[in-house]
């Protein structure tokens, strides 16, 4: 499976805008290729929002990246000028083992 992890530095984003963005990101959980998704704030740095997403394989991640519901969220993050760091890693875990 593929873990897609994104770190968003929201230090320059107003709280209301940030909450709305986090809700938009969380709504991506309903997309067919998303096996598991969580959005949460960093426990040590309150300015950071993290996205943890799991896909069954690299093809599912590729489809997600161009999905018409995902693209506007990415564009919004860019328009807000939010610095991001992305990490995509493959593991031999099974999606069925996730909570």
Residue ranges and their predicted role:
Residues 1-49, 56-66, 82-99:
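Short S/T/G/P-rich N-terminal loop/turn motif that feeds into the first structured element of a domain
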């Amino acid at each position: 499976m593929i873990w897609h992890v994104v770190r968003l530095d929201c230090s320059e984003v107003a709280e209301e805008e940030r909450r709305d963005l986090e809700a938009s990101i969380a709504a991506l959980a309903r997309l067919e290729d998303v096996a598991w998704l969580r959005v949460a704030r960093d426990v040590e740095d309150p300015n950071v929002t993290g996205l943890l997403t799991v896909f069954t394989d690299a093809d599912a991640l590729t489809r997600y990246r161009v999905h018409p519901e995902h693209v506007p969220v990415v564009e919004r993050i860019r328009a807000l000028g939010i610095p991001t760091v992305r990490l995509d890693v493959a593991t031999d875990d099974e999606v069925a083992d996730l909570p």
